[in-house]
């Protein structure tokens, strides 16, 4: 049928060819027929000689792809009744070549006429639409399954070289792919930045089937799709941030090699995915960030828990056209032994599931812990001085520009109203309280529960940060020529190489620290879920373009980031879990060079659990993880890398890493605490003896505990009670800080001498103490055998603090001394109390105005 030139070009483009190729072909054949134009392109007479199938291009309609994978389900061959084996695809090209029959009609669109049969050359091009052509050179096609099984790795290496510029597979990647080739499920645990993504990207290129990847974040899926397009792999993502409904329709027609989808969406798409598996084939279901499956993990997501529907709905016993179950590959960088077991059970993976483990040890990461009162802005100057000095060395060429940028940024009125040259500090000069109230009002309208300091929690992250309004969710496979056009970094970008990410617990801190860093001349940006999406996208882009030096962020930032030149990760405040810490710290040093991972924490205070929506069971687990973080920070004698690696169940091969602060500075001197431990244990034992016997069996009065009011309060005295009684009985330890005794109690608990009295409620550190049988045997009152221990961080901190008095009693006695009284009064006069006006935006402020109307008039 003859068509006009424009219609003919449109029809050829919808088949999947480039528009320029179509124009040239139509012009060459005189616009006579579609068949002639297609044949002209396929014979290599056109401009580039390249055939681009629809699966590798972003077409505008909901059309179906060309070739074997687009054949209607009614195709007469018996092979179409079932999804073939993975290895069948290794020889499919050879089989198609031998067949004498022609292909059936190729459906392009319901309104288009069928394309007639083409020559043998056309059939060769159409059959392996998704196949990696470089893996199947002429004359080297496989003839049998055994040959396919023995040579698949060679083909993978060819794909790696041609598509990704990688010479060969790593050992864990080879093991994971071997498991997939054997049609078995797999759980891959590999360190961040080790190349887990290749484990599920290769199957799509190797077989020509579709790979479905479940991923938790839209931003993560967006980045992955963009990277794949640069490697000539077509991909799309489906989820709440996907605004184009046509993309889902095209994805379910098999038009993309890899489909990224969020867990909430994949449950809805079970039926369309089953149809996709029947018509085109699904090579693999990959569950990225699989730790989100486990309720014991640090990043549990309820919708991940529902992914067991994949095993239930894509097994050979339920679908007749499947010869084997569609393999499931779960991947994560952080999972303890308990989390691993929970993942396998929750996903209903088979008993033959292979667990692929790599070492969690990253030798180029230097871990350290430093004391800081992170809640106070007065600590910023001391804590970030090294950071300022680091970037000041590179400031000579850009110093003047930074000053201008800082002034310009103060004039901005919106977090997103800046160009690529502006610093990401916006209207920080506004009243901080008004800014917080406006953010709270904005978020409360969405029905979100936020704490006073706008704490980041799981729900908030995935609902706010990840709901980006992405303009395009499908990504074309870019031609090779585009891959070579890698932009050369400018001198300015080179000066900014070596980025820093500062993780903070609250949104307020992210803004305050970013403001401070901008004030001292650094190029910094705040990133948290309450900021406008435009600002977040700009920060994300500038971070990747090396236009920033520091990003100050909550946990909303960083998942899936593959930035090679991050030189320092700072956690400013206590951690919530070691899993999250190791994952976030692993974003540094991905180029293999040395990188620092520093934890700043107030070692004088135990961490508190950030508020979030948790069940009672999850709360107990959260406290356990918080306690592990606390002990990690207090450690002064054991290699930090060893602690982290063994936390994930891996046996650390060497005694130390020789790079963390403990290994480089060495542990503190051993201290004999036999006397202190015995004394504390005696006080504890005496109390419990009287409580248990409720008689005169124990000389309770001898320890000053006889008529204590605390004894009547549920018989549950806390550690501070015992410390106060110990001080009363022993003048020698009257000046010893409570912080030191807390550290000693923690050591005694670790040794098994004492334990928590109440096991119902989880706590970060021991509070209600009772002695153990081991303690009664080991801590013999008459035994003078020394008990040497390494003082922990809080114990060392207490020894450094200058104390002029011991406790509140000593402080109160100081008022009786005329000189001390005079000094204290002078300090008050020098720093008069600031009169605070009532804040009418708060209930307390409005009430104060009504009760004290004269204050508001002043």
From Swiss-Prot:
Residues annotated as binding ATP: 190-197
Cofactor(s) demanded: Mg(2+); Mn(2+)
Record's compositionally biased regions (Acidic residues): 427-436
Biological process according to GO: DNA recombination; DNA repair
Chain span(s) of sequence motif DEAH box: 288-291
Residue ranges of every copy of the Helicase ATP-binding domain listed in the record: 177-353
Superkingdom of origin organism: Eukaryota
Biased composition annotated in UniProt, kind: Polar residues: 437-448
Keywords: ATP-binding, DNA-binding, Helicase, Hydrolase, Isomerase, Magnesium, Manganese, Metal-binding, Nucleotide-binding, Nucleus
Catalyses which reaction(s): Couples ATP hydrolysis with the unwinding of duplex DNA by translocating in the 3'-5' direction; ATP + H2O = ADP + phosphate + H(+)
Expression (tissue specificity): Mostly expressed in roots and seedlings, and, to a lower extent, in leaves, shoots, shoot apical mersitem, inflorescences, flowers, siliques and seeds.
Enzyme class: isomerase
Function according to Swiss-Prot or TrEMBL: Plant specific, probable 3'-5' DNA helicase that may play a role in the repair of DNA.
Protein's name in the database: ATP-dependent DNA helicase Q-like SIM
Natural source organism: Arabidopsis thaliana
Native organism taxonomy: Eukaryota, Viridiplantae, Streptophyta, Embryophyta, Tracheophyta
């Amino acid at each position: 049928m003859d068509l006009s030139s424009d219609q003919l070009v449109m029809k050829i483009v919808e088949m999947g060819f480039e528009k320029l190729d179509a124009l040239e072909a139509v012009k060459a054949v005189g616009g006579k027929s579609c068949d002639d134009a297609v044949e002209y392109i396929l014979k290599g007479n056109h401009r580039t000689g390249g055939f681009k199938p629809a699966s590798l291009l972003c077409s505008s309609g909901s059309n179906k792809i060309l070739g074997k994978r687009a054949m209607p389900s009614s195709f007469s061959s018996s092979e179409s009744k079932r999804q073939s084996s993975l290895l069948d695809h290794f020889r499919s090209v050879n089989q198609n070549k031998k067949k004498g029959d022609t292909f059936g009609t190729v459906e392009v669109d319901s309104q288009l006429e069928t394309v007639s049969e083409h020559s043998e050359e056309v059939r060769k091009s159409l059959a392996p639409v998704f196949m990696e052509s470089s893996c199947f050179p002429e004359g080297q096609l496989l003839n049998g399954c055994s040959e396919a099984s023995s040579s698949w790795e060679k083909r993978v290496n060819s794909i790696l070289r041609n598509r990704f510029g990688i010479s060969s597979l790593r050992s864990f990647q080879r093991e994971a792919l071997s498991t997939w080739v054997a049609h078995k499920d797999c759980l891959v645990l590999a360190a961040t930045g080790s190349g887990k993504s290749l484990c599920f990207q290769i199957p799509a290129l190797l077989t020509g089937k579709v790979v479905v990847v479940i991923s938790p974040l839209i931003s993560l899926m967006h980045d992955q799709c963009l990277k794949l397009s640069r490697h000539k792999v077509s991909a799309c993502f489906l989820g709440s941030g996907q605004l184009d409904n046509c993309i889902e329709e095209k994805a379910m027609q098999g038009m993309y090699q890899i489909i990224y989808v969020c867990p909430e969406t994949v449950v809805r798409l079970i039926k369309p995915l089953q149809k996709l598996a029947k018509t085109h084939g699904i090579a693999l279901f990959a569950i990225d960030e699989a730790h989100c499956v486990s309720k014991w993990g640090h990043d549990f997501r309820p919708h991940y828990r529902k992914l067991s529907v994949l095993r239930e709905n894509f097994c050979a016993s339920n679908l007749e056209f499947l010869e084997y179950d569609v393999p499931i590959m779960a991947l994560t960088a952080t999972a303890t032994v308990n989390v691993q077991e929970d993942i396998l059970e929750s996903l209903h993976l088979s008993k033959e599931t292979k667990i692929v483990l790599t070492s969690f040890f990253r030798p180029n990461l230097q871990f350290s812990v430093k004391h800081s009162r992170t809640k106070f802005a007065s600590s910023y100057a001391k804590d970030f001085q090294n950071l300022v000095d680091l970037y000041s060395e590179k400031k000579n060429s850009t110093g003047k520009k930074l000053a201008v940028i800082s002034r310009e940024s103060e004039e901005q009125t919106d977090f997103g109203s800046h160009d690529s040259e502006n610093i990401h500090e916006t209207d920080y000069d506004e009243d901080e309280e008004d800014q917080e109230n406006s953010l709270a009002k904005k978020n409360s309208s969405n029905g979100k529960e936020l704490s006073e300091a706008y704490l980041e929690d799981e729900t908030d992250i995935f609902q706010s940060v990840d709901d980006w309004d992405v303009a395009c969710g499908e990504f074309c496979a870019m031609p090779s020529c585009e891959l070579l056009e890698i932009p050369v970094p400018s001198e300015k970008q080179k000066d900014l190489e070596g980025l820093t990410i500062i993780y903070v617990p609250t949104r307020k801190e992210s803004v305050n620290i970013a403001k401070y860093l901008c004030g001292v001349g650094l190029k910094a940006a705040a990133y948290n879920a309450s900021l406008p999406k435009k600002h977040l996208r700009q920060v994300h882009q500038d971070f990747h373009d090396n236009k920033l030096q520091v990003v100050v962020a909550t946990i909303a930032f960083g998942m899936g980031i593959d930035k090679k030149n991050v030189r320092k990760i700072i956690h400013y405040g206590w951690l919530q879990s070691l899993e999250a810490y190791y994952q976030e710290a692993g974003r540094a040093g991905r180029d293999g060079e040395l990188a620092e991972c520093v934890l700043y924490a107030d070692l004088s205070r135990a961490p508190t659990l950030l508020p979030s929506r948790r069940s009672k069971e999850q709360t107990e687990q959260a406290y356990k993880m918080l306690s592990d973080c606390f002990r990690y920070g207090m450690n002064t004698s054991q290699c930090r890398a060893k602690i982290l690696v063994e936390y994930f169940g891996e046996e650390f091969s060497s005694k130390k890493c020789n790079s963390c602060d403990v290994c480089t500075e060495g542990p503190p001197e051993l201290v004999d605490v036999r006397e202190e431990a015995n004394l504390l244990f005696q006080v504890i034992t005496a109390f419990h003896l009287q409580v248990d016997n409720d008689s005169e069996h124990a000389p309770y009065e001898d320890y000053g505990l006889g008529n204590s009011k605390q004894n009547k309060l549920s018989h549950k005295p806390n550690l501070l009670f015992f410390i106060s009684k110990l001080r009363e009985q022993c003048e020698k330890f009257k000046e010893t800080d409570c912080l030191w005794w807390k550290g000693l109690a923690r050591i005694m608990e670790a040794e098994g001498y004492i334990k928590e009295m109440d096991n119902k409620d989880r706590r970060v550190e021991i509070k209600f103490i009772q002695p153990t049988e081991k303690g009664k045997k080991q801590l013999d009152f008459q035994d003078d055998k020394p008990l040497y221990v390494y003082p922990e961080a809080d114990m060392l901190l207490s020894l450094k603090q200058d104390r002029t008095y011991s406790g509140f009693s000593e402080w109160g006695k100081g008022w009786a001394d005329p000189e001390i009284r005079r000094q204290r009064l002078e300090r008050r006069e020098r720093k008069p109390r600031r009169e605070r006006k009532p804040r009418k935006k708060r209930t307390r402020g409005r009430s104060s105005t009504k009760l004290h109307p004269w204050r508001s008039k002043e």
